[in-house]
Amino acid sequence: MKKTALAFLTILMVSCSASKSDSGKKPLYEILTQQNNGGASIRFFEILSEANEIKMLQGDENLKNKVKSGDIKNSNFVILNLGEKSSGGHSIGVEKVEETADKIIITVKETHPQEGEMTTSVMSNPYTVVKINSKKEIVIQ
């Protein structure tokens, strides 16, 4: 009986210690929201790096629980706005983010409906908000 209890306890201890340890390192970027509507009527990319600039993000219903005041000390935020489109099927997002010694390079991916593809006949204003977990200079391509 004691051997069975000891074997069970040993297996329990080994299985508990085998779990992965999280290094606590944040990813280079996080997509905070990607929406088909709600963006501006013109195409633009904006980098927010000051505390007063993120107040509008904190007031947004989709972002208020994702953006904290202290985030601006270690992060920048990027708004990617596709502009007004006459139909659905359009989106804007991040294809990749690369970090070099002195800057962060964001490659933007725009998606549009293909010729003849069925889409909704409603105006759309796609946008994406990205959190970059770095204070390096940001270059958008």
Q: Where would I find each of the regions flagged by the language model?
A:
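Bacterial Sec-dependent N-terminal signal peptides
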Residues: 1-24
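Exposed, flexible binding/inhibitory loops of compact, secreted disulfide-stabilized domains
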Residues: 16-141
